[in-house]
Amino acid sequence: VGEIKLDCGRIVGLTGYARSGKDTFARILVDEFHFKRVAFADALKSDLASYLGISRTRLDTEKEALRRALQLRGASLRAVDPTYWIRLAMSSIKYYQGAGCNVVVTDVRFPNEAVALRNMGAVILRMRRADQPLVTEDADTSERSIDMIDPDEVVLAD
């Protein structure tokens, strides 16, 4: 993992467009380096499953079909409280840090998420594929805001 120190309690935040390799990179950190995985969207997925009356497993297996519903639900609660999802994720991160674990956050999409993680000492990595299409004007806010995050390093995921 390059020059990133893997001592106890380390936090790595991953940012990048959809299908840029964030989950694949996180899986390597979890499987090979024993990181604990956290996502800002974990609580959102549980919330949406409850709201729609479906299983959480269904959200994970039908990810593409339900992506827009996740985006809308996340945005609606973020409009009321911009730190809502951040506070929920921070609880998990602090728990793992307290247990001496390294943590990878797989879905840093908004600048305030990156700031919150950096305030905890995180390094932010931007995942990029060489063939990654540019984000279009009609892309969701969560995709467009990724470009406002200044990463510590860019990882080419090919």
Descriptions of predicted regions:
Residues 14, 105:
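Hydrophobic anchor at the beta1->P-loop junction of P-loop NTPases
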Residues 17:
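P-loop (Walker A) phosphate-binding loop of NTP-binding proteins
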Residues 40-102:
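ATP-dependent small-molecule kinase phosphotransfer cores
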Residues 1-12:
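Extreme N-terminal, non-catalytic leader segments
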Residues 88, 112-120, 126-158:
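Small-molecule kinase domains that catalyze NTP-dependent phosphoryl transfer to phosphate-bearing small molecules
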Residues 22:
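Conserved lysine of the Walker
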Residues 30-38:
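Post-Walker A helix-loop "phosphate-sensing" segment adjacent to the P-loop in P-loop NTPases
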Residues 25:
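Hydrophobic positions on the alpha1 helix immediately C-terminal to the Walker A/P-loop
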